[in-house]
Regions:
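Short catalytic/metal-binding and nucleic-acid-binding patches
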Residues: 1-155
Length: 155
């Protein structure tokens, strides 16, 4: 997509360091399936032989109800970076997350700590951490967000 076609996905005039909940989706570059092992590579293994939900990382919401496929090393890097967000940003918590084949979903919550990093900085750091470990730029430019404004949005 050329610069002239690029759409900015943030709400204009909204302060993304405002306390609250945010639903974030970050896609891989070219929407390539970097995060789950290939179905073809696992056809010789019975489903019961695979680790539970393939996660290997104690991360709330990291499950694949339809496939139970293990994460690739890039998927593990993403899951670990998600898990570590509260270590780097004490005012942020990950309520739920899931690593999909070519994207991740996060339900991030920011508490009321003045002067702390907002969603853009947190997502930028997480993306940079995964790309550095992978050795290449794994993510597409930007990300999608939805500001959770009430209980209806949260469910």
């Amino acid at each position: 997509m050329s610069e002239s076609q690029y759409r900015f996905h943030r709400l204009p005039e909204f302060d993304y360091s405002t306390p609250g909940a945010y639903f974030i989706t970050v896609c891989t570059n070219g929407k390539r399936n970097y995060f789950w092992e290939s179905v073809a590579a696992l056809t010789a293994q019975p489903l019961a032989a695979l680790p539970p939900y393939g996660c290997g990382v104690p991360l709330a919401g990291c499950e694949r109800p339809l496939h139970r496929l293990p994460l690739t090393r890039y998927g593990r890097y993403a899951a670990e970076a998600i898990r570590d967000i509260p270590k780097f940003y004490s005012h942020a918590s990950v309520d739920q997350s899931v690593v999909m084949p070519n994207h991740i979903h996060l339900l991030l919550r920011l508490d009321e700590t003045p002067g702390q990093a907002g969603i853009p900085q947190i997502v930028r750091q997480m993306k940079a951490h995964v790309s550095k470990r992978a050795g290449f730029s794994i993510w597409q430019r930007s990300y999608y967000d939805h500001v959770i404004r009430g209980q209806k949005d949260y469910l």
